[in-house]
C-alpha cells in the first residue's frame, strides 16, 4: 500500500475473495484449457468447486450446459468473478 492507496496485487486474501463471490457468476479455467461458467455455490480449502447453471466452453465454443457441476480442485488453474 502506497500513500494509503491499494495498488494492483494488494488487497484481499484468496479465501475472503472466494467467500464474497459465493452466489455470483464466475469463470473457472482448468489446467486442460476447458472453461466452466456458472453460479458459484461453494468452494473448499482444496479448491473443489460446485457450480449451478454451469456451461462448459472448449476453444471458445459452448459445448454443454449442466444444472449442477462439480470441479475437482487439482484441475483448477483459476477462478475469476464475472463482471
UniProtKB/Swiss-Prot annotation:
InterPro entries: Lsm6/sSmF, LSM_dom_sf, Sm, Sm_dom_euk/arc. GO terms for molecular function: RNA binding. Gene3D superfamilies: 2.30.30.100. The keyword Glycosyltransferase does not apply. One of its GO terms (cellular component) is U6 snRNP. Component of LSm protein complexes, which are involved in RNA processing and may function in a chaperone-like manner, facilitating the efficient association of RNA processing factors with their substrates. Component of the cytoplasmic LSM1-LSM7 complex, which is thought to be involved in mRNA degradation by activating the decapping step in the 5'-to-3' mRNA decay pathway. Component of the nuclear LSM2-LSM8 complex, which is involved in splicing of nuclear mRNAs. This is U6 snRNA-associated Sm-like protein LSm6. The gene is LSM6.
